[in-house]
Each structure stands twice: as C-alpha cells, then as structure tokens.
C-alpha cells in the first residue's frame, strides 16, 4: 500500500534529503561535540555554532546550536536545558572493522560513562552507543538457524564490549 503522502508521486522520485540527528543536551553540546570528535580520532569537525537569542529560554552562556560532523555524518547538538534526557530508546550504532578499532573507540566513548549489555555503552552525557563489528552482520547473514541462535546467545550474554573472536567462535559452534 502506498502511503497517502506519496499518492500521485512517481515511484522513482528521488529525494535529496539528508537525515541529521539532533541531540538535546542541557548545556554541554559544544563540549560533547569536541569529545566525540576526539573519540573518533579527530575524524570530525565542528561545522558551526549559533549563539542563544536573548529572548530564548536556552542557556545564554553557551551556543544554542552546535552543528558537527563525525565520520562523515552530520549532527546537531542543542543546548536546550534539562527538561529532556537521553534514553536507550535511541542509540547510535558504529560499525567497526576489527577488534583494535572496537577497543579504541569503546575506551574513548565509555570513559566517564558505563558499560551496558549486548555491546552497548552509555557515554558520560547519557547517550547510548552500540559499537558493533561488521563481522557480526556477516555472521548473521551467512549462518544457519543454529549458528544464529548461538551468536544471539553470545550477544545476549555479553555485558560491555564485544569480543569479535568470541562471537565468531559462537557462530561456528
């Protein structure tokens, strides 16, 4: 079924849109952007900051908007005050190619935060991250039902970062 908003549009209509996650901070958006850029080994930059308007309810001594890039993905950090907090309902997944990259990124992001189940962590700002080896998705698509069950069991029993060799061994049986 075609959604009503798409009725009458050609099926091959190309949309030149970009998804830009907006992250709501109390007042640490600029600090968080710099922290994330450092965690990604400098693979990012602060694009722009926008000062708070005098009539805005946002904090006046920090930028209200901090636009930044991480690994080619654009984000917006908003210093909007304490009314909203991050939760696990939304997480950022970073797919890494090997254990060294996983270990380095994990250590940088979990610093001041906490380890969570299933390869997740919560950073010091409360934002949830999944640091996932690309091998995980390869194992899921290449394995049979028994291999996938073993892999999922290994994932569900993990608290903290993934050990790629352990996931591979679980999938192999």
List each language-model region with its residue ranges.
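Vicinal oxygen chelate
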Residues: 2-16, 45-48, 69, 76-79, ...
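Core segments of cupin and vicinal oxygen chelate
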Residues: 11-13, 22-72
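Short, well-ordered beta-strand elements within core beta-sheets of diverse protein domains
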Residues: 21-24, 91-97
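Intrinsically disordered, low-complexity acidic/polar segments
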Residues: 30-32, 77, 86
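Short, solvent-exposed loop/turn segments at the edges of secondary structure
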Residues: 63, 87-89
